[in-house]
């Protein structure tokens, strides 16, 4: 899940790797350098404030969205075990600049969701969050019944995103909103 505030979750520590304090991180980011390039990062344990930690090195496991990382001061498996399930964060004001017509997934939260019915746009709900495991999914709350539905964020289903005017249009396959 991505939370719209000053932090953006870019990965989760899933497990330890080896005995020298290395960790496996599941990436939620399109920017691999967040896990490869040494420098300061932010970690957050459950129900705690984020804290700084220095990334020393990292590499990507072939064919996976998993990175093996090494943080300064984490030198044993026991130290690494304490960081399992931590979130790897970046400050939302440090997001990379994008080209025109591009946007960060974080910007989709709170957009109105519209469908085209009989040549008319109808507001049916709003994006309340995102889920990003293997594919990006929009979590949409429908206004008619406050039901939450997951919508795949693909061009065929979400043909238009208008950040400037605060809405997106979905073209869901029959039955998707009734699930």
From Swiss-Prot:
Molecular functions (GO terms): ribosome binding
| InterPro entries per UniProt | PRC_barrel-like_sf, PRC_RimM, RimM, RimM_N, RimM_N_sf, Transl_B-barrel_sf
Q: Could you say which protein family the record assigns here? A: Belongs to the RimM family.
Gene Ontology CC terms, in alphabetical order = cytoplasm; ribosome
This protein's domain notes: The PRC barrel domain binds ribosomal protein uS19.
Any single GO BP term: ribosomal small subunit biogenesis
Q: Which region is the signal sequence?
A: none
Primary gene name: rimM
Specify the protein name. Answer: Ribosome maturation factor RimM
**A matching Pfam family:** PRC_RimM
Question: What function does the entry list?
Answer: An accessory protein needed during the final step in the assembly of 30S ribosomal subunit, possibly for assembly of the head region. Essential for efficient processing of 16S rRNA. May be needed both before and after RbfA during the maturation of 16S rRNA. It has affinity for free ribosomal 30S subunits but not for 70S ribosomes.
Record localization: Cytoplasm
Keywords from UniProt, A to Z, are: Chaperone, Cytoplasm, Ribosome biogenesis, rRNA processing
Question: What species is this protein from?
Answer: Prochlorococcus marinus (strain AS9601)
- For the keyword Protein biosynthesis, the answer is no
Annotated PRC barrel domain residues: 100-176
Subunit notes for this chain?
Binds ribosomal protein uS19.
Tell me yes or no: is Disulfide bond among this UniProt entry's keywords. Answer: no
């Amino acid at each position: 899940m991505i939370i719209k505030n000053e932090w953006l979750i870019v990965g989760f520590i899933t497990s330890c790797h080896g005995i020298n304090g290395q960790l496996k991180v599941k990436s939620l980011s399109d920017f691999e350098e967040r896990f490869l390039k040494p420098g300061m990062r932010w970690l957050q344990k459950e129900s705690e404030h984020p804290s700084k930690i220095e990334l020393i090195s990292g590499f990507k496991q072939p064919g996976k969205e998993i990175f093996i990382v090494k943080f300064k001061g984490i030198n044993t498996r026991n130290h690494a075990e304490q960081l399992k399930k931590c979130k790897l964060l970046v400050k939302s004001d440090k997001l990379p600049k994008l080209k025109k017509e591009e946007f960060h997934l974080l910007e989709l939260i709170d957009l109105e969701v519209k469908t085209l019915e009989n040549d008319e746009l109808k507001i049916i709900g709003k994006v309340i969050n995102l889920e990003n495991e293997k594919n990006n999914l929009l979590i949409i709350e429908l206004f008619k019944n406050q039901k939450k539905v997951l919508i795949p964020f693909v061009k065929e289903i979400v043909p238009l995103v208008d950040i400037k005017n605060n809405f997106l249009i979905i073209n869901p396959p029959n039955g998707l909103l009734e699930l």
